[in-house]
Amino acid sequence: MSLRCGGAVRTVGPRVFGRYVFSPVREVSFLPDEKKEFLQSGPDLQEFISGNLADKSTWDEYKGNLKRQKGERLRLPPWLKTEIPMGKNYNKLKNTLRNLNLHTVCEEARCPNIGECWGGGEYATATATIMLMGDTCTRGCRFCSVKTARNPPPLDANEPYNTAKAIAEWGLDYVVLTSVDRDDMPDGGAEHFAKTVSYLKERNPKILVECLTPDFRGDLKAIEKVALSGLDVYAHNVETVPELQRKVRDPRANFDQSLRVLKHAKEVRPDVISKTSIMLGLGENDEQVYATMKALREADVDCLTLGQYMQPTKRHLKVEEYITPEKFKYWEKVGNELGFHYTASGPLVRSSYKAGEFFLKNLVAKRKTKAL
C-alpha cells in the first residue's frame, strides 16, 4: 500500500497514521480574523515545508533525541506539531464523500494538509486523493496500518462512476487516484483504475488525473493499461532506499520491481509525468538516500517527494530518526541538482500536496503544448 476535527481544544497529543500526523486544533471560527484569514487562504508549499505554521523559535531549543537509542521511543519534535488550516470547501467535500460512499487517503490517514488541498484557493489547485478498491490490502508493509486480508471484499462495480460523479460535483482541478494492493485479482485492479480515469476524462476533459498505483506484481500489461488510460501523472512509490526494502515493505515488493514500474510507464507513454516518494527516518544513511535519488533520476523519474516516516501504531516500525527541516531542505537542493523537474522535501510533505499539484498542473500543460 502506497499511501497519502474541529470543535473544542483537546489536550491529547497528535495522532499518527501511516506517514501522517494529526494535531487537533481550535475551530477556525474561534481565531482572530487575521489568523482566520491566513489559515483559510493557506500557506504556499515552501512555507509549509519549512514549518512556518509551528513556532520556529522553539526548534533550536529542542533538546530531545532525534535518533532512537535501543529501547527508546522518540518524542515528536516541534516542527511536526502544526495547525491544520481548514478551507471553505471542507464540509462540502466531506458530505459529498459520505453520500457517494467514497474513501480518501486525506481523511483515512488524517493528513495535515487536508484543509489546504480540499480548499483550493485563488492561486491553488483544489485537490483530493481518492482511495480505490476498498480499504483492505492484500499486503502487510511494516510502515502502513491499512487493514490486510488474503481475500478482501469484491470490488464495487459502481466505484469508477461514483468517483467521476464526485469530481464533477466538487469542481476539482486535480485528482489523485490511489489504491490498496489487490494481489487477489488477475490484473491487480488495473482495469478498475483505467475505467475510473476514463469516466473522469469523459465528464471533464480538463481535469488532471494522477494515479498512484501499486506495483501490480511487476505485470507490464497491467502497468500499460493504467499508463494508457488517459492519465496525466503516473506515480508509484519506492517508499525507502534499496537496503531497507525487506525491512519496511511486504516481501512481494522490492526496489527493482518498483523502478521497473516507473520505467515502463514512461516507455509506453513518453509524455507522461512520472513521480515517486521516499520516507526518511527509517534508518537510512545519506549515501543510501543519494544513491536512491540518483537511480530514480537515471530511470527518468520526473518528480520526487521526501517526507518524514511516522509510526502508525506500536506494532509497526519505530521511527529511527526525526530528520530536521534543514536536512530536508538539503535533499530538496540535491534533487534539483540531479535534474528532477520537481522536488518537494520536508517533514510534513506527502505524495500529494496542493502546491505540488499546482506545479504539476503547469508542467502537464507545458508538455501537452510541446506535443502539439
UniProtKB/Swiss-Prot annotation:
The keyword Transit peptide applies. GO terms for molecular function: 4 iron, 4 sulfur cluster binding; lipoate synthase activity; metal ion binding. [4Fe-4S] cluster 1 binds at residues 106, 111, 117, 352. It is an enzyme of class 2 (transferase). [4Fe-4S] cluster 2 binds at residues 137, 141, 144. Transmembrane segments: none annotated. Residues 122-341 form the Radical SAM core domain. Keywords: 4Fe-4S, Iron, Iron-sulfur, Metal-binding, Mitochondrion, S-adenosyl-L-methionine, Transferase, Transit peptide. It catalyses: [[Fe-S] cluster scaffold protein carrying a second [4Fe-4S](2+) cluster] + N(6)-octanoyl-L-lysyl-[protein] + 2 oxidized [2Fe-2S]-[ferredoxin] + 2 S-adenosyl-L-methionine + 4 H(+) = [[Fe-S] cluster scaffold protein] + N(6)-[(R)-dihydrolipoyl]-L-lysyl-[protein] + 4 Fe(3+) + 2 hydrogen sulfide + 2 5'-deoxyadenosine + 2 L-methionine + 2 reduced [2Fe-2S]-[ferredoxin]. Binds 2 [4Fe-4S] clusters per subunit. One cluster is coordinated with 3 cysteines and an exchangeable S-adenosyl-L-methionine. Gene3D superfamilies: Aldolase class I. Its EC number is 2.8.1.8. Pathway: Protein modification; protein lipoylation via endogenous pathway; protein N(6)-(lipoyl)lysine from octanoyl-[acyl-carrier-protein]: step 2/2. It is found in: Mitochondrion. Its main location: mitochondrion. Its cofactor is [4Fe-4S] cluster. One of its GO terms (cellular component) is mitochondrion. It comes from the Eukaryota. PANTHER family: LIPOYL SYNTHASE, LIPOYL SYNTHASE, MITOCHONDRIAL. HAMAP family: Lipoyl_synth. This is Lipoyl synthase, mitochondrial. It comes from Bos taurus (Bovine).
